[in-house]
Amino acid sequence: MHAVVINVSFTDFAAAKAELSGLVPRVSGAPGFVAGYWVALSQDKGTSIVVFDSEDSAQMLVGMVEGAPAMSVTVDSVEVGEVMAHA
């Protein structure tokens, strides 16, 4: 399994929360999706961890993120890594 870790800065926290209702179903419907977590670290920063069954599937999400129009967040970083353990 591979995870996509996305760190963002919120430009509009309330709008970002509202946009999740459309974003989460699109991501969870992606091929190879295993699990996803969207976390508000503060009113200014957030992170998400989305797990896929393969690196290729994870890289597809990276392409979606990089090609997405700016909305209520600024993407600070996107990284893919191998899941070493889970519980």
What function would you assign to each model-found segment?
Residues 1-47, 53-64, 73-87:
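Short S/T/G/P-rich N-terminal loop/turn motif that feeds into the first structured element of a domain
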